């Protein structure tokens, strides 16, 4: 017996009053306005912004594609759902018994009987809006599908062009997925409606389903199974970029078991769909029920159990041989997808002299004369303190490196734009007028030669010396007609990374009729005259931006008139990504002076994650290194299996103009997007020579290729499977070492071995894997890797490789940034001789284990903070690798303190040099060169006088060391091993003494360590 709800004895639907309806309608309209108006305002301001950068076509193409997808998918989804419900209602039973029904069902039936359209209309609308909202996010997939460009390269399994996987397969997968979802929604709508109108009567004696219900439900189920069959067919192709334990791509099991299983499941699904459709004419639901069981059973046995059995009983016992063919496919595809094939990478096998020769190393004058001693990751505070000018100017935490031709010679510089730093404004400078109409721009371009300081610094307690030799181009130098090494005609900076860090980052500029208002210098104001920015004089635009930034002053301020503009989105990287949303940009942008104007250069990548057999990798993980801790940008968390630096972009620092240039016109992904959005990317021929001279090989691409080359330099699939020929990217020794903590000691032995352990005389072939972030690559000027005897300097991005889970040096990678050889990668594979060449961490260990360095560290640590600069691994001639590391000090407990270069450490063939000058440090390891060639100061004094300065603080007292002679005069491996053991023992003693705090014991331990090092070096001298 049913019970009617209290207060409604009739059981009829409760009528809503006219006032109640009006209130309900008003609430709905208000909700819609709250949701829709901000989106309409955003769309309008975006349209204005794109117009200000001449990229309206991008906005229009994206908007129309999104709207088209929203309407099409939303409409089709709504039609599918409503059709399922309407058909069920249309073919409802004529005579419907109400007795015995739950009250809720009875009320719904009564409501639908009176006005079914009003009852049913909201469900399809809501579901259609949701489906359309989800579908419009795939607008890039649709555009790529309709503008696909062939790769001219096929996959090894199906022989299809790579473009099918890149552009077509994602679209077909999206269509099949939508069909399955739409059919499920229609099925549920049909099922529920049939239940409510009586077409589905569970427990009824005369049958649970009416004929109409049976036909409609089995038809929808059959369509779903057909879509599932299509999904099985597409699954075969997606196996080609499936991740396996060893590699990406279809494995032996995938090709020989899972692919046939997918075909079998495709056939079974077709049969099952026919079985479902047969129930339209055959009144027997056991047929589709059996079909469902068959499909599930086949999926379990054929789709899962069979491939698992093949994996366990056929592949696992002989996996290396079984997977050989498929690993070879992965190697070939990965090299092609990441542009690290033989056409791009040159391997120099057995690089390095059997016995390092300092004289031969000294012949590489191009590299030695350009050794970089200024670290862009350390010296930002120095730039800020010495070149800030005003409290509201600033520099990024990490400076940039670029090169300029000065007096006909290439010179690398630390460079930075002096930007406005809104976070540094004082309280009286932070009101709305000052923040957005007065303090609007930065001033100047600051550079410093990377291999020079103003003068040599001897004392950590002194303020003299060790500072960059600044070359400034700003308003003062222009107004005073001062000579500029790097001339700039427009030094004002309205767009940059630092100024964009404020929230919101907009400025309102233009002639307000009352004269210049913007701060320029202490004695002058300025009015922006650039082409960039959105006109904001009209009330419509003012209202739109007042809503966008939630700022009423934009509406009320009398400083805004018909000449006013608003500039925002001032981060160069964000501007490029907004104009080209299909690009992934490099995390590093850098300023360059091009034709007298400061321009930000941004590297843009085209990427895919569906390249068959190519290694699928995380961009964020592969580009992470120790510089992330400095607050730098982190790459997007996106997985890719293909990458190209296809676009070089510039953003004018004054007016924000965005220019995109095709840099790899052969890239099919770039070609696809140039067809989808014509006119946005300029052809490569439009790149000026001056701009091309400042292009750098991008860091993020280099890091990705470096990580992959560590494994994919292996040609043999068998070696690839066993990992025994892999390399590794070393951890950053300047982060993992302890030079910044005077009370601690190195974490490894003097040659990178475990503390207190023997390396067996092999030069450090231990299996300890260093913890810590990866060492970043470094920009340097060196001799040509392909022709080290040439005097022509080249601008290279370099990195070392260590052995797999070893610390010795395995190889050295460099990528050229020179216009004529841009992108050519050279890998010097270290000659496998004993003792093995030092890796970066081993070189770091042996340098900071030097007694002279340890003593200086102890003394300086009382009053100053000691910071290590970047450890550069520089191949010299065809000889060996020279490690160079600058040391900086900064006074403690002073807000205005800043780092200064105090010492230079070098390591060559396990010998250590340590001095205030590079020349002295090189002499200590036996590399004699022209003192004027490697002079690092600008005092004008030749460093030949430095030969008498061995008594300077911090200078090593050892004499120049020639190379180890060959033959009987050299030390045996056993002698070397014993000497290394002595050094390790001495290091342990130093650690113990430091832990105890006994200065007497520490002094004795340091003396013992010095004696052990001297004994080891004596073996190298053949004594």
Predicted regions and their residues:
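Soluble extracytoplasmic regions of secretory-pathway and membrane proteins
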Residues: 3-20, 26-51, 56-996, 1000-1021
């Amino acid at each position: 017996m049913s019970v009617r709800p209290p207060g409604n004895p009739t059981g009829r639907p409760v009528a809503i009053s006219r006032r109640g309806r009006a209130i309900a309608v008003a609430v709905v309209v208000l909700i819609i306005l709250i949701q829709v108006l901000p989106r309409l305002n955003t769309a309008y301001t975006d349209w204005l912004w794109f117009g200000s950068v001449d990229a309206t076509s991008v906005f229009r193409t994206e908007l129309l594609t999104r709207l088209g997808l929203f309407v099409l998918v939303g409409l089709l989804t709504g039609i599918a759902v409503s059709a399922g419900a309407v058909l069920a209602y249309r073919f409802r039973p004529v005579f419907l018994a109400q007795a015995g029904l739950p009250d809720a069902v009875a009320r719904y039936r009564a409501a639908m009987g009176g006005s079914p359209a009003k009852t049913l209309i909201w469900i399809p609308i809501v579901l259609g809006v949701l489906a359309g909202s989800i579908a419009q996010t795939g607008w890039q997939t649709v555009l790529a599908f309709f503008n696909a460009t062939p790769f001219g390269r096929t996959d090894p399994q199906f022989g299809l062009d790579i473009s099918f996987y890149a552009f077509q397969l994602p679209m077909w997968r999206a269509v099949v997925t939508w069909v399955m979802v739409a059919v499920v929604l229609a099925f549920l709508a049909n099922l529920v409606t049939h239940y409510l109108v009586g077409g589905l009567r569970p427990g009824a004696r005369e049958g649970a389903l009416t004929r109409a219900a049976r036909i409609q439900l089995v038809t929808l189920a059959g369509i779903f199974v057909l879509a599932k069959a299509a999904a099985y067919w597409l699954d075969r192709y997606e196996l080609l970029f499936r991740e396996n334990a060893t590699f990406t791509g279809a494995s032996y099991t995938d090709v020989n078991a899972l692919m046939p299983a997918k075909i079998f499941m495709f056939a079974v699904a077709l049969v099952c769909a026919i079985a479902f459709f047969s129930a339209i004419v055959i009144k027997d639901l056991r047929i589709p029920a059996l079909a469902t069981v068959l499909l599930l059973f086949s999926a379990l046995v054929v789709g899962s159990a069979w491939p698992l059995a093949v994996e366990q009983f056929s592949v696992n016992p002989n996996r290396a041989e079984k997977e050989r063919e498929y690993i070879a496919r992965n190697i070939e595809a990965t090299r092609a997808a990441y542009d690290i094939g033989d056409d791009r990478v040159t391997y120099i096998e057995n690089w390095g002299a059997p016995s390092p020769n300092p004289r031969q190393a000294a012949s590489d004058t191009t590299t030695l004369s350009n050794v970089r001693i200024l670290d862009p990751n350390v010296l930002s505070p120095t730039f800020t303190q010495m070149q800030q000018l005003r409290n509201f100017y600033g520099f990024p935490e990490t400076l940039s490196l670029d090169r300029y031709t000065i007096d006909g010679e290439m010179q690398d510089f630390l460079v930075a734009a002096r930007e406005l730093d809104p976070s540094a404004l004082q309280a009286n400078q932070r009101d709305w007028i000052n923040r957005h109409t007065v303090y609007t721009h930065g001033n100047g371009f600051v550079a410093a030669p990377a291999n020079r300081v103003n003068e040599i610094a001897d004392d950590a307690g002194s303020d003299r010396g060790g500072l960059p030799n600044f070359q400034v181009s700003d308003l003062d130098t222009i107004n005073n007609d001062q000579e500029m090494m790097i001339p700039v005609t427009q030094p004002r900076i309205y767009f940059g990374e630092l100024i964009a860090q404020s929230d919101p980052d907009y400025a309102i500029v233009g002639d307000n009729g009352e004269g210049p208002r913007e701060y320029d210098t202490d004695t002058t104001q300025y009015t922006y005259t650039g082409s960039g920015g959105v006109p904001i004089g009209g009330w419509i635009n003012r209202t739109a931006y007042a809503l966008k930034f939630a700022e009423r002053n934009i509406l009320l301020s009398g400083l805004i008139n018909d000449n006013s503009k608003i500039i925002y989105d001032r981060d160069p990287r964000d501007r490029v990504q907004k104009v080209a949303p299909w690009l992934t940009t490099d995390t590093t942008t850098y300023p360059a002076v091009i034709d007298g104007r400061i321009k930000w250069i941004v590297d843009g990548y085209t990427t895919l994650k569906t390249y068959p057999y190519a290694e699928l990798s995380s961009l964020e993980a592969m580009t992470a290194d120790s510089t992330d801790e400095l607050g730098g940008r982190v790459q997007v968390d996106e997985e890719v299996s293909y990458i190209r630096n296809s676009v070089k972009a510039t953003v004018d620092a004054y007016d924000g103009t965005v220019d995109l240039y095709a840099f790899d016109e052969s890239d099919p992904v770039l070609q696809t997007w140039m067809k989808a959005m014509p006119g946005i990317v300029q052809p490569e021929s439009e790149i000026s020579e001056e701009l091309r001279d400042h292009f750098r090989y991008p860091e993020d691409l280099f890091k990705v290729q470096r990580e992959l080359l560590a494994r994919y330099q292996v040609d043999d699939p068998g070696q690839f499977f066993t990992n025994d020929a892999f390399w590794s990217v070393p951890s950053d020794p300047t982060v993992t070492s302890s030079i910044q903590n005077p009370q601690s000691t190195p974490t490894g032995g003097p040659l990178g071995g475990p503390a207190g352990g023997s390396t067996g005389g092999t030069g450090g072939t231990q299996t300890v894997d260093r913890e810590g972030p990866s060492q970043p690559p470094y920009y340097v000027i060196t001799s040509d890797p392909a022709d080290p005897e040439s005097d022509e300097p080249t601008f290279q991005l370099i990195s070392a490789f260590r052995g797999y889970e070893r610390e010795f040096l395995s190889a050295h990678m460099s990528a050229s940034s020179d216009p004529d050889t841009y992108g050519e990668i050279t890998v010097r594979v270290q000659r496998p001789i004993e003792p093995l060449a030092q890796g970066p961490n081993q070189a770091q260990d042996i340098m900071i284990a030097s007694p002279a360095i340890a003593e200086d560290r102890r003394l300086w640590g009382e009053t100053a903070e000691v910071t290590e600069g970047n450890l550069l691994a520089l191949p010299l001639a065809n000889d060996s690798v020279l490690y160079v590391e600058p040391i900086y000090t900064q006074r403690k407990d002073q807000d205005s303190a800043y780092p200064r270069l105090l010492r230079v450490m070098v390591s060559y063939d396990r010998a250590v040099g340590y001095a205030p000058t590079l020349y002295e440090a090189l002499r200590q390891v036996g590399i004699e060169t022209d003192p004027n060639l490697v002079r690092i100061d600008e005092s004008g004094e030749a460093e030949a006088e430095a030969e008498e300065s061995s008594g300077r603080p911090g200078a090593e007292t050892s004499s120049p060391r020639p190379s180890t002679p060959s033959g009987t005069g050299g030390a045996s491996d056993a002698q070397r091993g014993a000497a290394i053991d002595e050094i390790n023992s001495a290091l342990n003693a130093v650690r113990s003494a430091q832990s105890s705090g006994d200065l007497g014991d520490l002094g004795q331990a340091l003396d013992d360590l010095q004696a052990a090092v001297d004994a080891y070096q004596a073996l190298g001298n053949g004594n």
